[in-house]
Structure formats: C-alpha cells, structure tokens
Swiss-Prot record:
SUPFAM superfamilies: N-terminal domain of the delta subunit of the F1F0-ATP synthase, V-type ATPase subunit E-like. F-type ATPases have 2 components, F(1) - the catalytic core - and F(0) - the membrane proton channel. F(1) has five subunits: alpha(3), beta(3), gamma(1), delta(1), epsilon(1). F(0) has three main subunits: a(1), b(2) and c(10-14). The alpha and beta chains form an alternating ring which encloses part of the gamma chain. F(1) is attached to F(0) by a central stalk formed by the gamma and epsilon chains, while a peripheral stalk is formed by the delta and b chains. It is a peripheral membrane protein. Pfam families: OSCP (PF00213). The gene is atpH. Belongs to the ATPase delta chain family. Disulfide bonds: none annotated. GO terms for cellular component: plasma membrane; proton-transporting ATP synthase complex. The keyword Membrane applies. It is found in: Cell membrane. GO terms for molecular function: proton-transporting ATP synthase activity, rotational mechanism. It comes from the Bacteria. F(1)F(0) ATP synthase produces ATP from ADP in the presence of a proton or sodium gradient. F-type ATPases consist of two structural domains, F(1) containing the extramembraneous catalytic core and F(0) containing the membrane proton channel, linked together by a central stalk and a peripheral stalk. During catalysis, ATP synthesis in the catalytic domain of F(1) is coupled via a rotary mechanism of the central stalk subunits to proton translocation. This is ATP synthase subunit delta.
C-alpha cells in the first residue's frame, strides 16, 4: 500500500547520496540503523509510545546516531520520525537497494535449493539469467529443505519453479481431478 511512498523517500535519499558520492556509505549506514532499531526493544517502545513527543523522539535519535551516521542520513531519519514513518525504515532501505541495482544495471535473483549450489551450477545460473535479463545478476541463495529437490528462482516478479514439492502438488491435483 505504501510502496510508492517508500520509493519516493528512498529515491530522495538516493539522489542526495549520489550528489555526495556516498551511495555505498548511505546504504551501509541505513542497514546499520535498521538493525539497531530491529534489535532494540527499547528503541521500538520509544518510537511506538504515543505519550513520547515527536520532538523527544528526535532528540533521542540524534543522541544515538549523531556520530554514527552521516548528517544527511540523520536528517532523513528525523524527517521519518516527524512523518511517523520511521518504523517502516526497512522498506525504504529495500527500495533504495532496488534503486541502486537498477542504476547499476543489476538485478537480484533469489534462489532456493535443498543443498548449496556447486560453483559451476552457480556460474551457469548467473550466466543464463544474465543473458535472459540482460543485466548483471546478484544471486541470493537460500537453503530450503521444504522444496524436497530441484531449484526455485525468483527474479523480480518472474518465478521459475522447478522444485519437486511443486511437481508433487501438481500430480496430486491431477489425481484428485480424475477421481
């Protein structure tokens, strides 16, 4: 529902990062802030607490992050607090990462297998996907025993499902239809 808004915030920050030649630094800083927020119950409680004023929340964030992140990132965080969007920072980070990939002619491919891919399999998959999408492929591998066997690949909205679990489900559906 708020993807468009997340994208706009991310694009604004990305443009500032580009102007300052600090895209990698900003991405790294945002990841660190997201991890700190996710792993700190106290920060989450403060951000969610209705009786703590916005100005107090901004003061707390300034105290925590002043010397840890770039001033422009801190300003971005304070705007998100003001607009009550700080709890959705991770979504903005994901959008910023997508923008980074787009601008660098790259695309993320999520791959699920039961066992890790061999080096040759990984290289072949990257090559084939690169040819199909005409972009540099960033492979994100995940081990998932529930697929039983085969490989599942998601690139953007495209899904290539060659898993044994899906084949078995399809066979089961066909058998139930015949009864």
């Amino acid at each position: 529902m708020y993807e468009y808004l997340d994208r706009r915030y991310a694009l604004a920050l990305y443009e500032v990062a580009e102007e300052n030649n600090k895209v990698d630094e900003y991405l790294r800083d945002l990841k660190e802030v997201v991890n700190i927020i996710k792993n700190s119950e106290d920060i989450c409680k403060i951000l969610k607490h209705p009786e703590i004023s916005t100005s107090r929340k901004k003061e707390i964030f300034t105290e925590i992050f002043k010397d840890k992140v770039d001033d422009k990132i801190l300003s971005f965080l304070l705007v998100l607090i003001e607009k009550e969007r700080i709890l959705y920072l991770e979504e903005k980070l994901k959008e910023m990462e997508k923008i980074y990939l787009e601008k660098n002619n790259m695309i993320l491919a999520n791959v699920k297998t039961v066992i890790p891919l061999l080096k040759e399999e990984r290289e072949e998959l990257i090559e084939k996907l690169g040819n199909k999408y005409n972009k540099k492929i960033i492979l994100e591998e995940e081990i998932d025993k529930s697929i039983i066997g085969g490989v599942y690949v998601r690139v953007g909205d495209d899904v290539l499902d060659g898993t044994l679990s899906t084949r078995l489900k399809d066979i089961k559906k066909m058998m139930l239809k015949r009864e």
